[in-house]
Curated annotation (Swiss-Prot):
Catalyzes the transfer of the cytidylyl group of CTP to D-ribitol 5-phosphate. This is Ribitol-5-phosphate cytidylyltransferase. The gene is tarI. Coiled coil: none annotated. Keywords: Cell wall biogenesis/degradation, Nucleotidyltransferase, Teichoic acid biosynthesis, Transferase. Pfam families: IspD (PF01128). The keyword Nucleotidyltransferase applies.
Amino acid sequence: MIYAQILAGGKGTRMGNVSMPKQFLPLNGKPIIVHTVEKFILNTRFDKILISSPKEWMNHAEDNIKKYISDDRIVVIEGGEDRNETIMNGIRYVEKTFGLNDEDIIVTHDAVRPFLTHRIIEENIDAAIETGAVDTVIEALDTIVESSNHEFITDIPVRDQMYQGQTPQSFNMKKVYNHYQNLSAEKKQILTDACKICLLAGDQVKLVKGEIFNIKITTPYDLKVANAIIQERIAND
C-alpha cells in the first residue's frame, strides 16, 4: 500500500507571536495545511493520508480538514516528540491498524509546504517503490560554507555537488522503521533528517528534483512570499 503522511507536528516558534501552530495560519482564506492536503487528495495512488498533529491540536486539525475537504482516506493521528518520532508514530499506526508488508511505502511531507506539485509526488512514489528511500532537493544556488565553531569557516564544499533538501521524503516503511530502531538513543536525539537514518544504515537515497517555489513557510516573511505566489497564480488563471 501507499501512504501519505503530512507532518503537522511543529509548534511554529519561528513564526513569532501567533496564537496557533503555523500550519493552521490562514493562506488566502484557508489554513496552510488545507492547501497542502489538497495536493495529496488529487493523487489516487494513496490508500491513506495521515495527518500527524500535536495532541492538543488534533481536534482543531480534524475540524479544519472537515470544513474544507471531504475524503475518507484522511485520518488525523498524534505526532511525536520530534520529526523522526512523528514519522515513526505514523508507521506504528499503520502497522497496528492495517498491518505492514515489505512493499508498503510512505511519502512524508511538511504541512507548511503547500506548493508541491503532482510531478514531485509521482516521482517520490515511483522512486520509493524502486529504491526504498527518496529525498526531494533543489540545486544549491548560493555557496555553502561550513563552520564547526560557528565563528570561522572550516570548509567550503564544491557548490555543484550541494543540494538543498525539501520534502517529500519517501521510504519503504519497514526498512526505515527497522533502521530507526537499530539506532542508539544518542543518535536518535541528534538526527534531524529522516534520510540520514537510511544513510547511516548504508542505504542509497534517491534524489528527486524539487522546485524553488516548494517553499517551507516558517517565518512571517515566508508567509508573505506564499501569499504573493498565490496571488500571482490567481492573476494568471
